Amino acid sequence: MNFVQENNQVLYIWGGTISADIEQEVNQLKSIPGVKVNVENAERVLLGGYGQSQFDIILANVSTGNSELVSHLLKLTKPKGKAVFKDDSAAGGAETVRANLLLSGFINIASAEGNVYIAEKPNYEIGSAAKLSLGGGANKAKVAAVWKLDVDDDGEAEERIDEDELLDEEDKVKPSAESLRVCGTTGKRKACKDCSCGLAEELDAESKGAAVAAAQSAKSSCGSCYLGDAFRCATCPYLGMPAFKPGEKIQLSDTQMQADV
């Protein structure tokens, strides 16, 4: 009875049949100022309809091996409230009782004479959550300050790079159009598929100019080119042209340039 204080809410649980000792203990509890006592049989506790965290002290003459009942008594106890068990049926003694109470959620378990065991409910409700402070704020501030540069700091130890020193005189020379060409810069001169630097047009003009020059400078090696295709070689530059007089300048009319229908 030393566990009960004034104005406590007490749940007294008895097992078996009511005896004179039980009535005497209940009367002693009621004599404490402000104490309210609820008396319940062990088999009826689960059906009693008591509220969660209702009692400051629970006095239970029950077996701690009944895990369902012990867990229910934990719910009925207020945070930091106590439950006092009198267990005469524990086969393994104090260690077994201690293990049963710990597995049910009680802490700070102590034993007393007469197979009496005192257990305490943790200072929080079952299912409650609490925010953990892992000290991340201080570490974040330190990390953020590592790369921070003070623009007003004129300390002599600070070394800065002059951007002008990163460029050589060759880098400052304006490039020419030839140096910017992409196609035709490796091996044989060949324009890209989507040439935009002018090389395609240049090569096309060169090829046409070469063909014209070849035609203008063409000379007969057989001496019979002017006679017509029947007397011309397969590689004759005048192949396909009409016969002409030796030394005559060849000009094709518009009608000759049109294909026959």
UniProtKB/Swiss-Prot annotation:
Binding site for [4Fe-4S] cluster: C222, C225, C233, C236
InterPro entries: Anamorsin (IPR007785), Anamorsin_N_metazoan (IPR049011), CIAPIN1 (IPR046408), SAM-dependent_MTases_sf (IPR029063)
Chain segments carrying region Fe-S binding site B: 222-236
Locations listed in the record: Cytoplasm; Mitochondrion intermembrane space
Positions of region (Linker): 134-173
Residues where [2Fe-2S] cluster binds: C183, C192, C195, C197
Cofactor field: [2Fe-2S] cluster; [4Fe-4S] cluster
GO BP terms: iron-sulfur cluster assembly
HAMAP family attached to this UniProt entry: Anamorsin
Family, per entry: Belongs to the anamorsin family.
UniProt comment concerning the protein's domains: The C-terminal domain binds 2 Fe-S clusters but is otherwise mostly in an intrinsically disordered conformation. The N-terminal domain has structural similarity with S-adenosyl-L-methionine-dependent methyltransferases, but does not bind S-adenosyl-L-methionine. It is required for correct assembly of the 2 Fe-S clusters.
Known role: Component of the cytosolic iron-sulfur (Fe-S) protein assembly (CIA) machinery. Required for the maturation of extramitochondrial Fe-S proteins. Part of an electron transfer chain functioning in an early step of cytosolic Fe-S biogenesis, facilitating the de novo assembly of a [4Fe-4S] cluster on the cytosolic Fe-S scaffold complex. Electrons are transferred from NADPH via a FAD- and FMN-containing diflavin oxidoreductase.
Protein name per Swiss-Prot or TrEMBL: Anamorsin homolog
Originating species: Culex quinquefasciatus
